[in-house]
């Protein structure tokens, strides 16, 4: 919508400028011819010349109206021609660029894209590798940072009771095969005499009854 209006305005200005230049030139030429005409008439009517013969009429001098018309035409034509020429020169000089939101947004987009590409293409920073002496004297902490230590339930218990429980529960070694076999032999040895004594007691009671 704005582009057709701009084209119409520039076309109208160029047409008006052309008309002013042409009309000023025509009026100036007409005034110059009028000036030359009455100047020639004044030259023919100068006193001191010989009187013409009686059969030829004496030419009359130019009227004051013709002089005023010639002066007005010369002045107006020169003014119009000067304005038209100055306007043409001013129009031919390129002015400052007009603000265009489309071009401005496009320039900003290209600017941001170029700046991001330049930042991505930058060389990485060079890290100084420490020497052996620096590494020994200033050890570098490796690994992730340790989380803050929070008190647990075990830490909240009194240390005295925990030590007492540990002292009352001796650490027994795990049973071996030899210890298990010895325990079984001892149990079998204890049960065998009692069984024989009970059997002999039953035999004696049976004999006494008979």
UniProtKB/Swiss-Prot annotation:
Species this chain originates from: Homo sapiens (Human)
Main location: membrane
Name of protein: Transmembrane protein 61
One Pfam assignment: TMEM61
Keyword Heme (UniProt): no
Tagged with keyword Heme: no
Annotated stretches, region: Disordered: 140-172
Subcellular location: Membrane
Membrane-crossing residue ranges in chain numbering: 18-38, 69-89
Membrane topology, as annotated: Multi-pass membrane protein
InterPro entries noted in UniProt: TMEM61
Keyword entries, A-Z: Membrane, Transmembrane, Transmembrane helix
One GO CC term, this protein: membrane
